[in-house]
Structure formats: structure tokens, C-alpha cells
């Protein structure tokens, strides 16, 4: 049985497990039964928060979990979660993760609600996050819902109130797509 009926994401990993992100825990279905992962305040290797927003497995087999207060990586060998700390110069940390992608070049890009876009260069060890301040300043919003890379390696960024953007990380070109006057808003 699922931990909650409010589902934010469903994801199948390369081993065939179905993962379900809910607003009250993370569920893993092995084809027969569900395992439920929840936050445990006395266990630093438990799920960081029960409100799980997004799930993603990268090309190296790392399984990422985005919660409303940070990013974790799941360790299959130990069945534990490890937090990756993301800090900004202004002292803010533990962003609300809304979307995670891997670009064709192997870099991870992370959309957040409140702290803009974050990138993680492929093979950076230890994990070195780059807050994409210039990009979010140009967009005019730190509230990003979804990030997607197209076949031309452009990033498409859907915001909560500023519409849709196409961004080329290489050329830094940014194109805005706003709602026509007869649509109620630019929440994408």
C-alpha cells in the first residue's frame, strides 16, 4: 500500500523498481510489494523530508531525490540516503527541488522553487554546485517548476510566474515565451 495518495512523481529506475514520490514519503515497488521510506529525525541517513517532489537517475546510476528542503542521493548498497548540501552566498541552503535533469554532456541541472537554477558539473568531486545566478537574474525569478533539455542542447525552463524560457548554456542566449494577453497568467 502507498504511503500517500498525493503523488508528485513516478519513476522507473534501471533495475526496474518503480519509485513513487508522495507528499508523505517515498515508495519503492519491486513488482510484488511496496517499501516505504520516511524521514526519521534520529537517523541522518533517512529520507530528508517526507514531502518528495522529484526523482531522477543519472547515466552513472546515481538515484537523486528532490525534497521540499534539499537534495539527496540514494545508496542502493546500504539502502540509505545521503544529503548533498547546496549553499548560496547569501547563506540560504537546502532548496526546494522541483526538477532534476542530466544534460547530454553529463552535467546535472536542478530547478528549485525559491533559489533558481543550480548546476553540478560531471565528475566534480566532491560535488561542487554552481548557483546559476546570472540566468535567474535574467529570467527575473527564482521560482522554477521544470527544466528540460531538447535535442539541440537548449534548456527549457518553466517558471511559476514569468512564463517559459529557452536557454543555451553555451551561448548564454535566452528567449522568453510569455502567455498571450487573453490567458490568465505565466505560471507554467
Regions picked out by a protein language model, each given a short descriptive name:
Residues 1-188:
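Carboxylate-rich, polar loop motifs that coordinate divalent cations or form catalytic acidic clusters
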